[in-house]
């Protein structure tokens, strides 16, 4: 198992995303651990002590502060630890093109401006109205996701929220139906999530295996149950008249990009 340490002198989200993108190419053979706020030489020393005995590891660093970044690189060379400095080369090239000295301001991307507060508000909105907890959020949502269970509605809502988009999701369950409010809002902001039946069966079976569920939950992944749900979902989505997105073998980021493009959001 390879451990990728995402190291930053700020919150570490950028380093973590880069590390996770790399780790995802190796499925269960790589994990990511985020280590934020490495702001001093002492912090670097503590970091090295923590990871130097790791048999298979590497560092993905987005440290901005020059002396801290260089010291970390030096210590990694001494300890034979692989390190990738993600931002250093990019900043150097940008500096050359612009003929301007960089600010070297850790966390500048996450300054508490209007965009930051919009993201926080959207994330709180997504958690409050997740999985039909409260339908009152429908009219205030920027995006409404409608789909069967295990079509990535919740993680997609959270991803969109991180972009400052208020998203709410409505599960399609034959025994429950959908709220009438769904037919009263602008259908341009509603997106139906569809998926290949075989993939959905596989996803649900894996979930049952993970939690060792039996009895009533067996129906959850049965062919007949999923066929019933697909027929119900098709009926509802046709009635709404909304746009649909096939999420089969599609990454959450790709689905989010499609939605953002449809909404005209960059």
Swiss-Prot record:
EC number: 2.7.11.32, 2.7.4.27
Binding site for ADP: 147-154
Superkingdom of origin: Bacteria
Stored Pfam families: Kinase-PPPase (PF03618)
InterPro entries named among the record's database cross-references: Kinase-pyrophosphorylase, PPDK_reg
Keywords noted in UniProt: Kinase, Nucleotide-binding, Serine/threonine-protein kinase, Transferase
Enzyme class: transferase
Keyword Hydrolase found: no
Catalytic activity, as annotated: N(tele)-phospho-L-histidyl/L-threonyl-[pyruvate, phosphate dikinase] + ADP = N(tele)-phospho-L-histidyl/O-phospho-L-threonyl-[pyruvate, phosphate dikinase] + AMP + H(+); N(tele)-phospho-L-histidyl/O-phospho-L-threonyl-[pyruvate, phosphate dikinase] + phosphate + H(+) = N(tele)-phospho-L-histidyl/L-threonyl-[pyruvate, phosphate dikinase] + diphosphate
This protein's record includes keyword Nucleotide-binding: yes
UniProt record similarity statement: Belongs to the pyruvate, phosphate/water dikinase regulatory protein family. PDRP subfamily.
Functional summary from the UniProt entry: Bifunctional serine/threonine kinase and phosphorylase involved in the regulation of the pyruvate, phosphate dikinase (PPDK) by catalyzing its phosphorylation/dephosphorylation.
HAMAP family recorded: PDRP (MF_00921)
Protein name: Putative pyruvate, phosphate dikinase regulatory protein
